[in-house]
Amino acid sequence: MSKKYFGTDGIRGRVGEYPITPDFMLKLGWAAGKAFRRQGICRVLVGKDTRISGYMFESVLEAGLSAAGADVLLLGPMPTPAIAYLTRTFHAEAGIVISASHNPHYDNGIKFFSGQGTKLPDELELVIEELLDNPMTVVDSAQLGKVSRINDAAGRYIEFCKSSVPTGTSFAGLKMVVDCAHGATYKVAPNVFRELGAEVAVLAAQPNGLNINDRCGSTDIVALQAEVLMQRADLGVAFDGDGDRVLMVDHTGAVVDGDELLFLIARDMHEHGKLQGGVVGTLMSNLGLELALQDMGIPFVRAKVGDRYVMAELLARNWQLGGEGSGHIVCCHHSTTGDGIIAALQVLRALKHRGQRLAEARQGMRKFPQVLVNVRYAGDKDPVGHPVVQEACERVTEQMAGRGRVLLRKSGTEPLVRVMVEGDDESQVRLHADNLAKIVSDVCA
């Protein structure tokens, strides 16, 4: 049975356009509360990022949950992985995040965590969707859920992040720039690194509700590159709006993406006998990551795109480490979801172990040129499965003769087809990607 509202990462869209409306979110809170309460009395944590619409949606979700008889604990602006962690530590039945992650302020969305801090199973999302079709009711007054605020959430999460590196770890002597994307990490990320001894300069940590991800953060890293060079810093760290992604910049201003960060963490864990099993990437992971891990004898498998699928593969194999080129990195031995701050700490620890700067340490992996072109489409078309598109992909694959790969997939959150071509010749890769994108666009017309 297919889902009507839930995509690969919850429900997301433009504020004011269905289903990202106050009336739908009220009903969603109620339906979720009904689903969570099937085991009896329940508590639900609710957190958000810094976009202005979060306050509106927090209020209606709170009302819907309470109407269903669920107690609500409000965390305020907090990173998505913090909500996953706090859901576990408060022994809540579920956690809810109000965020559109790396999207602009005019978008918003909702995603859920189970009581174990993992993404909700598909079956429970389907139950919530079924309940949305029912008329909304309110429990008796004596059974209404209570609502309260947690005032020490940031401090709890800071200590949790610091606990992901061994006691006594110090990054004294490290000069870094931290870009918080005017998002959910603005209160916590700089303090985590400072409390571990680093000298920290901070960018984009003055959220006003409208500037989240605006020319800052992991999706627009130009300002961080300039600041790292101006400050003569050792490196820069950029988070996205909700703190589940991280990218870095080395001292030369070069960007270090999620695949390279995953390699650095995996190599360090492997060299210190800490890596359990192998590494999970995605269909979009750079071929260079796979080959670098292969050279070290580290198994590598690809999951579907999306950190929930990376996590599912890790759990199925009882492995610890996985991630995506976008900077979603999951360290199962520390967290139950992608956590930008914790991933950054593991990279810093790896650099400390090797006594190298980021620019040197990244040389252990050779990235293959990879070109990604997004093609927007409308309606219920399936351009990926179109015979003309399939034939074109097969033709390009044959031309690359084992020196690269082609991947077309539909986005789980937007009406986009992502055309990815990867190979050892950058000019040919770009030519193939542009040609395939035009074919997809023509089919969609």
Swiss-Prot record:
Active site per UniProt: S101 (phosphoserine intermediate)
Query: Which residues are involved in binding Mg(2+)?
Result: S101, D240, D242, D244
Which cofactor is essential here? Answer: Mg(2+)
Q: What's noted on cofactor binding?
A: Binds 1 Mg(2+) ion per subunit.
User: GO annotations under biological process?
Assistant: carbohydrate metabolic process; peptidoglycan biosynthetic process; UDP-N-acetylglucosamine biosynthetic process
| Molecular function as annotated in GO | magnesium ion binding; phosphoglucosamine mutase activity; phosphomannomutase activity
Q: Which GO terms describe its cellular component?
A: cytosol
Question: What is known about its processing and modification?
Answer: Activated by phosphorylation.
Q: Which residues carry this modification: Phosphoserine?
A: S101
| Entry keywords, A to Z | Isomerase, Magnesium, Metal-binding, Phosphoprotein
Q: Gene3D superfamilies this protein is in?
A: Alpha-D-Glucose-1,6-Bisphosphate, subunit A, domain 3 (3.40.120.10), Alpha-D-phosphohexomutase, C-terminal domain (3.30.310.50)
Q: Give the EC number(s) listed in the UniProt record.
A: 5.4.2.10
One short Pfam name that applies is PGM_PMM_III
| Function noted in UniProt | Catalyzes the conversion of glucosamine-6-phosphate to glucosamine-1-phosphate.
The UniProt entry's sequence similarity note says: Belongs to the phosphohexose mutase family.
Q: What is this protein called?
A: Phosphoglucosamine mutase
The protein's organism comes out as Azotobacter vinelandii (strain DJ / ATCC BAA-1303)
